[in-house]
Each structure stands twice: as C-alpha cells, then as structure tokens.
C-alpha cells in the first residue's frame, strides 16, 4: 500500500536568528523566526509525513505553546515523526522538496541537506530530492521577508 502526503510551511526572516535548513546552519544576515529552530524545510517534510499517515499537522504534535519545543532542533522532531511512521509499518518511498528563497543561494548546501534528510528518514539518498528556487523578486520570498517550502512524500507499507 502507498500513502502520499503534502506539506507546506513559511517562516519570516529576521535579524538575530540562525538560518537552519535540514539541520544545516547556513551563513546569512537573517534567520528564520519560530518557536523551535524554525527549520522551514524540515517542518514542511514533517507535515507531509504526518499528512500521509492522516495524523494531523505539525502543530498538533509539537505545539508552539509547549516550552519543551522552544529552540529544539527540527531534526530531533523529525526523528519522533519517523518513529510514528515506523510504528505504523511504513517506510519512505521517496520525497521531493522545494525551498523558495531569494537569498542566500542554497545550491551549495543541497547535497548536505539531502544527506541529512536521508539519514534521518532512514532511506537511500536517491529517494530524497531537495530543490531551491527564487521567486524572481516576487512575493514575500522575493522581498526577502521570508522563506517558504513545499514537500510531497510517498510512503510504502513494509
């Protein structure tokens, strides 16, 4: 049996915060605002995984009102989501993610993002796609007010 999920997330860019994507601290003058480390890519992926399992969304499992999650690494939260997936007898078929950001250029970091996500998802690198794009200076991403991300996942029963 196959299950498919889609995820979407947005975080504002602000001064004084790190820019973390797939667990990588990317040098930039601004970072993402959020209760946790605000890793928009990993949040999107977790939302897609939870959706594929019909388990609700990220906020249901890790509410921003819970102090246990303040500043937490989203990669640690992804480990918890993977436990839910494994408990239900599913594994990753493949994932496809896209990040929309005007700056910084993310292409140099994509190989490490893929490796980090593949390791956390307990899957082969060939099952993990991460892409980055600009919005040609259009919208909030283009004005460098925030970064958005989308992901789709295919889960397989094992």
Curated annotation (Swiss-Prot):
UniProt-annotated site: Transition state stabilizer, residues: 35, 134
GO biological process: isopentenyl diphosphate biosynthetic process, methylerythritol 4-phosphate pathway; terpenoid biosynthetic process
Keywords of the record: Isoprene biosynthesis, Lyase, Metal-binding
Binding site for 4-CDP-2-C-methyl-D-erythritol 2-phosphate: 9-11, 35-36, 57-59, 62-66, 133-136, 140, 143
Pathway(s) per entry: Isoprenoid biosynthesis; isopentenyl diphosphate biosynthesis via DXP pathway; isopentenyl diphosphate from 1-deoxy-D-xylulose 5-phosphate: step 4/6
UniProt: a divalent metal cation binding residues: 9, 11, 43
Molecular function in Gene Ontology: 2-C-methyl-D-erythritol 2,4-cyclodiphosphate synthase activity; metal ion binding
Quaternary data: Homotrimer.
Family: Belongs to the IspF family.
Protein name, UniProt field: 2-C-methyl-D-erythritol 2,4-cyclodiphosphate synthase
Gene, per the UniProt record: ispF
